[in-house]
Amino acid sequence: MDYKTPIRNDGEMVEQQILLSGNNSIKKNLAIYQRKILINQEITNESVTEAIYYLYTLMDLDREEGVEKNPKPIDILLNTPGGSVWDGLILVSLIEQMKDMGYTINTTAIGTAASMGFIIFITGSNRYSYRHAQFMLHDISTMMGGKVKDLEESMEDLRKCQKQVFDIIKKYTHVPDEKLKEWIDHKRDMFFYPDEAVELGIVDKVL
């Protein structure tokens, strides 16, 4: 459903079309007025689309105000068990692109940042954690069925996706290779808590 939402811009009220699915007024107000994007659900096509929509909306507003070259930081607040790797990587790509454009995209784990939520979290310019937050990594999983050739092709795609995830982890953290190898070899969920996450270069500061 479309809603026309007034947004304050240099003392004037302007009309901005905001697409809302259900009752998202809290998320909308956080995003538009406080530059805080809340992801408090699974990583799905819908939740990623919503986050991307708000990021583009903020970029549009910055251009209208003439501050796109020196924008205020944007905060992404995470409490998610993870979800779709493919959808999550789209958001990761946009965050990285915006950082290259000069944006500061901070991430804060307010609860759980697990699986794909973990990957989104570590791409932040500055990464913060609430004291009782938790982080979790595990191997990529999928539900597959069909002919042998189809399964082989799907597995190859999965391995490529897994490598992308590994490269992101190595780029943004100090998680040792042996821990990542343990993750794959033993199919273990790897849990981290704030203090350990700081040591591993996952978290910059515990709030």
Regions of interest found by a model, annotated:
Residues 1-207:
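Terminal-region recognition feature
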